[in-house]
Structure formats: structure tokens, C-alpha cells
Amino acid sequence: MAARDDAEARAAQREREVADLTTQVSFLQEELTALRRKLTESPRQARVLEERLHEVQANLAAVTGQNERLVATLKEARDQIVALKEEVDRLAQPPSGFGVFLESREDGTVEVFTGGRKLRVNVSPAVEVDSLKRGQEVMLNEALNVVEALGFEELGEIVMLKELLEDGRRALVISHADEERVVKLAESLVGQPIRAGDSLLLEPRSGYVYERIPKSEVEELVLEEVPDISYEEIGGLMRQIEQIRDAIELPYLHADLFREHKLRPPKGVLLYGPPGCGKTLIAKAVANSLAKQVAEKTGQSGKSFFLNIKGPELLNKYVGETERHIRLVFQRAREKASEGTPVIVFFDEMDSIFRTRGSGVSSDVENTIVPQLLSEIDGVEGLENVIVIGASNREDMIDPAILRPGRLDVKIKIERPDAEAAKDIFSKYLIEDLPLHPEDLAEHGGSRGGTISGMIQRVVERMYTESEENRFLEVTYANGDKEVLYFKDFNSGAMIQNIVDRSKKMAIKQFLESGQKGLRIQHLLAACVDEFSENEDLPNTTNPDDWARISGKKGERIVYIRTLVTGKQGTEAGRSIDTVANTGQYL
């Protein structure tokens, strides 16, 4: 009984276990089915998750970019706010003034000129008082204290210096209205080599002059130079050169002998004669020769000055201006001469500005210009090392008071060159190192010197032969006499130089065309013919007598001129000079 109960109990137990196992099997089967279904669906879910991941990453990148843009915008806005604040602060500041520094005081304050007032103000610690210079511009704050040092004024009025005062820090100047004013020299000008006649920059409110304008009024009219022309470069004028050396160099180099003999050196020299014959050339050579003589005498480097006055530019439409310019020229000469330097004041075309008083047609400006020059020349009497040289084609038009002894003492006529002088002039331009044609060299045995001499001899004979082809003019005098003039009567050093230049150009053209290099006698002869042909129409003034005087023909008055030229187009008929178009040239 008991055994049966026990068996039933175990059977019931097994049934329960079987039921549990069956339940578990069913659950596991369901789980297995669910897992199989999930396994089947997992690739699709993975794709969905990947898509969501990409979408989230894209959204994240967009949000990040937007965030960066917002940060940049905020930074830019902050910078703009700071800049605007600075601008507002700057605009809200009171204005700064400017003044001119005058001088410093022992207590650390300085005196400035501002707003038409002279003030004593304090200086910012950032500015060194010792570095401030008189006339310097300074910046002032609202309390009118110096806060910054600036430069010197660059704008103002132009005034002319009349003289420096004794203290060396003030000067007497002349304004544009001829008003005289005492001004102060800024620190930039103190100690600088300024002289009377210089143009200065003036700031009229403060009364300071700041700088020297490079081109002074006198320098516009005076060419200040040291010529490099020597007497050896001048041909055909040995007698005139000796005369001018005796007149100018001897008194300077042997002043003790002149004093011993109580001989007064000449004050000036007049060089007169036809155009192109070397008047200006001689005047330039004098300065160069003086410099060399000074160097030999003193053992130091010699230096001389040649003040070449541009005569017609001295004339000015305002009354008294021309006379003032002349005074400034001689004042400049005295300054140079006071340093022991020989100075030559050269007036070229002297007849254009110092004509005989009373000969003017309308203005009679010479009535005041000539006396000014006379007073300056007389003022040179007690001054050493200043020589006045005048040059003119029409010495008969210069005021006689200038030409009298005691002013322009020495008068030297520069004549037209004769045949011997022409050979000397040609030898200055035709030298042995020029390229010569082989055929011409062969004619003279290969001697370069002999070839040059032969060329010069041939061309001079061509120029100075009184042949039919060299006839130039027939002049009729007031008494009825007639005279035939040849080209040689109008020859000059300038014409000879032009002939040589023409021949050299012909030689160059021949080399370019044929390849044969070298100067030939044919080039010189052809150049001579061309020069004569071009000069055929030059004596074309409507006043033959004036033309003759300029050309160096003196004597009986000429009333009629007829040309006698055998040119490239044959012999031309004679013609009155009055019928030729007036081109304003002179032979």
C-alpha cells in the first residue's frame, strides 16, 4: 500500500517534470523560432542603423559648421565693437594744436608760438626737451602742453636774403612787396652757407626761415662754372691771347711788381669782333689759365670762377629790377673773390644791355642800367681778383662811358682768321689719330702728319683763293664805289669747325655705304663748298650797313649788297638784299 502510494507519487512527479520539460521545450522552440526570425531580419536592421548613423553624422557636421560660423561672426562682431569703441573714443578726444618751438627754460618748460601767441608750456615726459630745435614744429594737447616733436615747416613764402645780422641767428630779408623784415633762422639754417641774394622759405606767422631754395634769383642769370678750355685749344689767336694774358694774368700773378711800379691793373677787358671768331672761347680760357697759375704759385689746387651773365635775361619789365640783378651779380663776384679766388665776370653780347644812353626807341632802359654797371666797375677798384670781360659784335653801340680808360681799359679786337690762322684752327680739329683713307695716306708716303698737313693746305687754298667760285658779295658804298668780297672775308673759327664736322660726317656715310673707312681731302673740299652754299642767303638784313658792322666790315657806309655766288645750281643773278626774306640770321 505504501509502495503503491510511493509509486504513484513518483509517477505524478515524473508527469510534472515531463510537463515542465514539455513547457520548456515549447518555450525553447518559440525562442528558437524568434531567434530564427530575428536572424532573418538582422541585415535589414543593420542597414537601417547604418543609415541612421550616417544621418546623425551629417547632422553633426552641419551643426559643427554652423557653430563655427557663429563663433566667427561673434568674433568679428566683437572686433567691430572694439574698433567702433576706439573710433568713438578717438572722435570724442579734444583737438590737438600745433606750435613752433622757440626755446627751452631752466625749469623744464618751453616757449612755443601758437595761434599768434607766445606761450610758456610744459612738456610731456615722452618728449626730450634737449632734442627740440628752434623753429621745429611741435604738437600740443588740449592743455597746450607739448606732447610730440615733429619736423620743420615745408610751406611758406619765398623771401630774398639781404644780409645776416651780427648774432648769426637773425637775418634781414626782402619780401615780394620789397618790404624789409627781420626774421629768425631755424636750427636747420644756422651754420649753413647762405649769402645775400639767396631765396629762403619763410613761415610768416612765426617769423622763422627754414631752408634755402636751391635756385636763387642770381643763379637764374649767372652760370657759375670752372671752364676746362685752355689756350692750347684756341687756334689762330696767339697775338690776342698774349694781349689778354698780359692784361689779366700778369697783374694777378705778379701783384708785388705792379705795386712796386705803382701800376694799376686794368679793371676790365672788351673783346670785340665778328661772330664766331673766339671771343667767348678766350674768356673761358682765361679762368682756366688763372686757376693753373694760382696752383703753380701757391702749390695748392687752383680754382677760378667764370660768371657767365646771360645778358638779355637781365632785363626785367619792372623798374629797378635789372639794376638790382647787376648789383647781385657783382656781390656774388665779391664773395668769391674775398676767398682769394680769381673771378671773371663775363658779359656776352654786351651791346644788347649796355647800349649808348639816349639811343633807345621807347623805353630808354639803358639810361639807368649803364650807370649801375659803371658804379659796380668803379667799385671793383679796391677789390682784388675780380676781372670784368665784355664781348660784343657791335662795340660801336656800347655806351662810351663803359669803354673809357679806367673801366674797360683793354680793348682787344678778335679778327677773322687769315690763311695762316685758318691753318692753325684746322690743326686743332684735324689731328693725327683720326681715321684717314689709305689712298690719301699713300700719297704722302704713309705719314699721318704729312697727310693732315696736306689736307689742311689744300682746303685753306680752296677757301682763301680769290677765284670766281669764291666770290660772295658785291657791296656798293654811299660814295658809289663798289667792292667784291670773297668768302674768305667772312671766314671764322666757327665756320672752320663746321667744315671739319661736315667732312667727318661725309666720311662716316661713305664707310656705311662702301665700307671704305677714313677721312679724305675730297670730303673737306666738298664740305667747304656746302658751307659756302649754305651761307649764300645769310646776309639778308634789310639794313645792309647794320649787317656789315656786325660782320666786321667798318668804314664807308654800305647802301646796297648783291650776291655773287656760283652754287650747286649755277651762277645766280645779283639781287638786292632787301628782296630776300628776313630770317633773322647773320653771317
UniProtKB/Swiss-Prot annotation:
InterPro entries, alphabetized: AAA+_ATPase, AAA_ATPase_domain, ATPase_AAA_core, ATPase_AAA_CS, NA-bd_OB-fold, P-loop_NTPase, Prot_ATP_ID_OB_2nd, Prot_ATP_ID_OB_N
Residues given in the record as ATP binding sites: G276, C277, G278, K279, T280, L281
Residue span of region Docks into pockets in the proteasome alpha-ring: 586-587
Coiled coil region boundaries: 1-94
Biological processes, Gene Ontology terms: modification-dependent protein catabolic process; proteasomal protein catabolic process
Stored SMART domains: AAA
Residue stretches spanning the membrane: none
GO molecular function: ATP binding; ATP hydrolysis activity
Disulfide bonds: none
Superkingdom of this protein's organism: Bacteria
Keywords from the UniProt entry: ATP-binding, Chaperone, Coiled coil, Nucleotide-binding, Proteasome
Any Gene Ontology CC annotation: proteasome complex
Subunit and interaction comment: Homohexamer. Assembles into a hexameric ring structure that caps the 20S proteasome core. Strongly interacts with the prokaryotic ubiquitin-like protein Pup through a hydrophobic interface; the interacting region of ARC lies in its N-terminal coiled-coil domain. There is one Pup binding site per ARC hexamer ring. Upon ATP-binding, the C-terminus of ARC interacts with the alpha-rings of the proteasome core, possibly by binding to the intersubunit pockets.
Annotated PANTHER family: AAA-FAMILY ATPASE, PROTEASOME-ASSOCIATED ATPASE
Family affiliation: Belongs to the AAA ATPase family.
Function: ATPase which is responsible for recognizing, binding, unfolding and translocation of pupylated proteins into the bacterial 20S proteasome core particle. May be essential for opening the gate of the 20S proteasome via an interaction with its C-terminus, thereby allowing substrate entry and access to the site of proteolysis. Thus, the C-termini of the proteasomal ATPase may function like a 'key in a lock' to induce gate opening and therefore regulate proteolysis.
Comment block on domains: Consists of three main regions, an N-terminal coiled-coil domain that binds to protein Pup and functions as a docking station, an interdomain involved in ARC hexamerization, and a C-terminal ATPase domain of the AAA type.
Designated name of the protein: Proteasome-associated ATPase
Lineage: Bacteria, Bacillati, Actinomycetota, Actinomycetes, Streptosporangiales
